[in-house]
Amino acid sequence: MAQVQYQGTGRRKNSVARVRLVPGTGKITMNGKPAEEYIPFANIREDMVQPFGVTETKGQYDVFVNVNGGGFSGQAGATRHGIARALLEVDPDFRGVLKSTGLLTRDARMKERKKPGLKKARKASQFSKR
């Protein structure tokens, strides 16, 4: 018998997360490691599981995430986006709740590129009038 699973892809900054939801106890595995080990910051982990709280499905699904690119924050954001999309597969009625909380929206903010002649994207050397 094939195991029921739901998939979703999330993106944030330079990170891409491929998320699989499997009915279970609520443990999260990221790139083969537990989420507590993979992302050391509790506040970022809490943001990551926000879709479960909004849809009241906390502890009902095990989450398997394959994520690459970016840092902790981007990867957690991509995972959150992927979980929200996977929950849509679980029940299309979740769309209204997820959309109103902004969890289905791809956060388009990216790092601004460095410009030639400047030290960073906007940081210039000190201006001297004379």
Curated annotation (Swiss-Prot):
Q: What is this protein called?
A: Small ribosomal subunit protein uS9
Family per record: Belongs to the universal ribosomal protein uS9 family.
GO-annotated molecular function: RNA binding; structural constituent of ribosome
Q: Where is the composition biased (Basic residues)?
A: 111-130
Its gene is: rpsI
Which PANTHER family has this protein been placed in?
A: RIBOSOMAL PROTEIN S9, SMALL RIBOSOMAL SUBUNIT PROTEIN US9M
Q: Name one Pfam family in it.
A: Ribosomal_S9
The ranges of region (Disordered) come to 107-130
Q: Which domain of life is it from?
A: Bacteria
A GO biological process held by the record: translation
Q: Name one GO cellular component term.
A: cytosolic small ribosomal subunit
Which positions form S-S bridges? none
Listed A to Z, the keywords are: Ribonucleoprotein, Ribosomal protein
